[in-house]
């Protein structure tokens, strides 16, 4: 069989992977086989955690709103507050409500008074 000259294709692929894993520690940034495995693992983790991040922030916002409503007797619970908001068609999302609850609690009182009327 004749010798096949492959050029720089494999080397280019390996250097691309090494650039991705250059900040990893130990053999994970040096050895080709482990770098490919760690690259795949890193990409899987980043995809999973992008989806998880949305869940975590939503939970945080709900916890903050619930804490303020229970602490200052704005409403009996978070779920009742949200139900009354939708009933009165005051469409505020949870992120904005959580920011209002932390920074300006008087505004939460005003919103709850609007709901009660």
UniProtKB/Swiss-Prot annotation:
One of its GO terms (cellular component) is chloroplast. The keyword Nucleus does not apply. One of its GO terms (biological process) is ribosomal large subunit assembly. Pfam families: Ribosomal_L20. Keywords: Chloroplast, Plastid, Ribonucleoprotein, Ribosomal protein, RNA-binding, rRNA-binding. Its main location: plastid. PANTHER family: 39S RIBOSOMAL PROTEIN L20. Binds directly to 23S ribosomal RNA and is necessary for the in vitro assembly process of the 50S ribosomal subunit. It is not involved in the protein synthesizing functions of that subunit. HAMAP family: Ribosomal_bL20. This is Large ribosomal subunit protein bL20c. The lineage of its organism: Eukaryota, Viridiplantae, Streptophyta, Embryophyta, Tracheophyta.
């Amino acid at each position: 069989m004749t010798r096949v000259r492959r050029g720089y294709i494999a080397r280019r692929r390996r250097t691309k992977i090494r650039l991705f894993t250059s900040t990893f520690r130990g053999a994970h940034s040096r050895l080709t086989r482990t770098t490919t495995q760690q690259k795949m693992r890193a990409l899987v983790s980043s995809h999973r955690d992008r989806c998880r991040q949305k869940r975590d922030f939503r939970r945080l916002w709900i916890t903050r709103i619930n804490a303020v409503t229970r602490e200052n007797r704005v409403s009996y619970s978070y779920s009742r507050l949200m139900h009354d908001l939708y009933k009165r068609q005051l469409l505020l999302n949870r992120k904005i409500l959580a920011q209002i609850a932390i920074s300006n609690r008087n505004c939460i009182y005003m919103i709850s008074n609007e709901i009660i009327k």
